[in-house]
Structures are given as structure tokens and as C-alpha cells.
Amino acid sequence: MNPPSGPRTQEPSCVATPASPSRWDGYRSSTSSLDQPLPISPTAARAQAAAWIPFPTVDVPDHAHYTLGTVILLVGLTGILGNLMVIYTFCRSRGLRTPANMFIINLAVSDFFMSFTQAPVFFASSLHKRWLFGEAGCEFYAFCGALFGITSMITLMAIALDRYLVITHPLATIGVVSKRRAALVLLGVWLYALAWSLPPFFGWSAYVPEGLLTSCSWDYMSFTPSVRAYTMLLFCFVFFLPLLVIVYCYIFIFRAIRETGQALQTFRACEGGGRSPRQRQRLQREWKMAKIELLVILLFVLSWAPYSIVALMAFAGYAHVLTPYMNSVPAVIAKASAIHNPIIYAITHPKYRMAIAQHLPCLGVLLGVSGQHTGPYASYRSTHRSTLSSQASDLSWISGRRRQASLGSESEVGWMDTEAAAVWGAAQQVSGRFPCSQGLEDREAKAPVRPQGREAETPGQAMTMAMAPWDTPANCELPLHPGWAFH
């Protein structure tokens, strides 16, 4: 007669013990089944579960875990190194430390932390084919993914609004956009993202494992009123609303660029009756720079679109048709949004490429950028050349603005003239070198000008000091929009 056997222990690859029934019940259907052990005490049961696997597993081939783990590792390394390079280059280069570029730096910071907090954990869990870091680790992992993902989306909306205001309302932004105001906007961005990332900690939805159960996210699979309400509000206020704002801004941005392109086509130079090669190059450059940010935004939205579709399918009641692969693959694609920013700037941003060649010469060689003409002196000249070109272009724009202001109230006219004089005073210093602008300047000189106070003199003097004789273009130029200088 065989002696009675003791309590059976479970192999690690077969155990699936949810940590909290209220949170993990929705995932039990996709986990492996357990053999029924002999009765043991509750204390021993808890110790046995903690000693093995405290989270459920899913029955899929090993190569599925390894493939996703390899992809997320490559994405994470690219995101960490690439965004660190963006942060370092923008902070070290004096010509790139502008209020507008603070938004780009913030985007790189959020993308860096997205890669730093998500990729290593996802990779380690994929190698072990199960979640390794317990319930608290799952909640923190999902919280970081939500916080940094929302921050990136709202930062892209702020970038679009900044471009919209500078390009379509250039005079209204003179002296308004500063580093302090940009910092306040970014503080609001982080607080907004934090406000939408904290509710799952307080019972409104939850942070739970997803897909192959090697990563975590908010609970979009449950069909409870609380979870569905959080999912819908989250998509409305952190995805669809920012996306609508971005679309609105870029519609008007490209309208302004198109109108200027049409003006270039009808413009004739002083001698010869055609456009100079430099005019065509400037127009092409402004088009390219306006498209850089749009490309970043489009890739970000496309990266998150599959994940959004999956979550909305679950919201609509079709969670039962979603497989673990359909949950995990879109999550990996969404996390890959963190690598687009540094890649696009390394390929298309001219000042960023020059700064890389200056501060990171080895990478400059790989990018095909020579550091020979990227020293501080060259950067100084390039910055002031852009400033001078921008001020000279204000000649035509201020004329139209003054005529519009004359139709408004007295207070509006005074404010517009004060702002315009700041740029007008600087532009007059070089007007003699722009023959095409001379006629416009003469006409403006004949018009009555409202007396200006000290407020208008100080910005004009500051802009005049920023100019240098070698920065003045010698050929005739068509003024372009003053807000189109990419910072």
C-alpha cells in the first residue's frame, strides 16, 4: 500500500493566481487552468502563491514573447538614446534655446521617460513570459505609461498652438512669448496629464495586465459603467480634443503659407521680372519647417491609433473578439511613438543637425553634417541673419496691419502701432539695402504716424542692436511671414 502523498505543489509555468479578484477576474479566461491542489491552510496558500507566480499567464508560443521583447528592447534603446541626444543638443546649443523650443525639449523629456520606464520592464517580463513585478509594479508601470503618453500628446497640441499664433498672428506675439510663459504652459501640461493618470489609483477604473500579460495598462476591457465612463472621457480629453485642435491649427497654418506662395508667384523682382533663386529657396525652407512638426504629430497619432481602436472596440462591447495579440501588438506600436521625435529632427531639422555636428562630432559624421562651419561664431551669424531677414519682412506685413487697425477703435490702433513700431524701427535700419521694399517704405513714411512712447523704443533698440552689417542680404527679397523662422 502506497503511503499518502502530501500536498501537491504547482509548476511555475502552470500557476495563474490573480492578486485581487476584483481586478483580475476579467483576465482569468485567457490564463492557463490550474490543477486542483489538496486542501491547505490559507496562510500556506498565500505563501505558495507568493513563492511562485502572483499574476496570471497566457498560453501562447514562447517565440511570441521573445519577438515582442526584442522589438520593445530596440524601441526602448532608440528612444532613450535618441531623446537624450535631443535634450543634450537643444540645451547645449545657444541658438536652439528659445521659448518655442522648450516645447520640443519637453516632448523629448516625456518620450525619454516613456522609453526608460516601459521598455526594460516589458522586455524582462517577456523573457520570463509572465509579469515579474507584482501588483504595485503593474500599477506604477501603467501609471507611467499613461502620464508620459498624455504629456506627449498635450505637448504636441501646445506646439501646434504656438506655431499657429506665431504664423497667423505675428504682431500679437511680439514680446508675449517668453521662457517664463512657456514654462508655465508646460507646467499646466504636466498637471493636466497627472489629473488624468491618477483616477485609477482611487477606484475610477484600474491599472491591470493586458494582452500577453507581460505589460499593464488601464482597464479598458471591463464593461462596467465606471470603466466605460473613464475610457470615454480619457479619449475625448486627451486624444480627440487635442487632435481637433492640432488639425484646426495646421489648416490655418498651411492656408497662410499657401497665400504667401501665391503672392510669390505674382511678385516680380525690381530688375528682370522674375523671382531670384534665393526667394524660391526661402519659400521651400518655410514649407519644410512647417511640415516638420506636422510630421511628428502625424506619426504620433498613427502610433496611438491602433491602441485607440482596440480600446474603443472593448468600450463598444466587443472585448470578447480581442485576442492577447490584438492587445499587446498595438501597445508596442504606441510605445514606439517615443522614437519618432529624435529621428525626424536628425533627418530634417537643419539647426539641430548643425548643433549635433558641433557638440557631437562623431554623430555629425554619421548624419553627413560637417562641423567645420558650425562653431559659435557661425551660429551667432546664422541667428542674426535670421533675425534681420525676419525684421525686413515686416515691412509689407505692418502696412496691412496698420490699415486694418485704422478701422478699429482708438485703443486698438494705439496698441497695434506700438507693437508695429518696435519692428518698424529695426527694419528701417536696413531698408536702404532692400530696393523692392523702398517703395513701400516711402509710402508708409508719407502716412501719419501716431507718436510712440518709451515702450516702443526699447524693443526697437534691442532689435537694432541684434543686427550686424554682414547679415544684410544684398539681393532683392520678397518679404515672407515674420513668424516663419523655425526656432
UniProtKB/Swiss-Prot annotation:
GO terms for cellular component: axon; dendrite; membrane; perikaryon; plasma membrane. Residues 89-102, 161-183, 255-291, 349-487 are cytoplasmic. Belongs to the G-protein coupled receptor 1 family. Opsin subfamily. Residues 440-457 have a biased composition (Basic and acidic residues). PROSITE patterns: G_PROTEIN_RECEP_F1_1 (PS00237), G_PROTEIN_RECEP_F1_2 (PS50262), OPSIN (PS00238). Pfam families: 7tm_1. Residues 1-37, 436-459 are annotated as: Disordered. Disulfide bonds join C138-C216. Keywords: Biological rhythms, Cell membrane, Cell projection, Chromophore, Disulfide bond, G-protein coupled receptor, Membrane, Photoreceptor protein, Receptor, Retinal protein, Sensory transduction, Transducer, Transmembrane, Transmembrane helix. Eye. Expression is restricted within the ganglion cell layer. GO terms for biological process: cellular response to light stimulus; G protein-coupled receptor signaling pathway; hyaloid vascular plexus regression; optokinetic behavior; phototransduction; regulation of circadian rhythm; rhythmic process; visual perception. It comes from the Eukaryota. Residues 1-67, 124-139, 205-233, 313-327 are extracellular. The gene is OPN4. One of its GO terms (molecular function) is G protein-coupled photoreceptor activity. This is Melanopsin. The modification N6-(retinylidene)lysine is found at K335. Photoreceptor that binds cis-retinaldehydes. Contributes to pupillar reflex, photoentrainment and other non-image forming responses to light. May be involved in the optokinetic visual tracking response. May be involved in the regulation of retinal hyaloid vessel growth and regression. It comes from Felis catus (Cat).
